[in-house]
């Protein structure tokens, strides 16, 4: 009689985990999250991508250090859509008044498509946020994808059916 070998599953890579987190969104939202992520990766190639999987949202921060507090921008995806947060939002010049929110540290804009990131007023905000960052991004290299937290309680990230 052969002894049965118990196969221990290999832990998922950070990229595989992120794909799983994104898969819980509606298909249209999945496409948006991936396209915005690609655009921000191009914009911040040396940034650490910090992923926080909360029960009602998926947050991806772009940090020069790997610490969330140092993130320059972050996306937050939920059933209501995708927002781009600027960590020093209240201090950023916003002549077109596109920044929303009233917090002491952040402001955000709604992202309808990755093309939103190419708008001159959004580009200006991104440039200023980069220039004003307390810690600057490394000039070269490729940042890592880091799963910072994953919620134990998983809830669907789709709009409730009416």
Specify the residue positions occupied by each region the protein language model found.
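Charge-dense, helix-prone N-terminal extensions
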Residues: 1-162
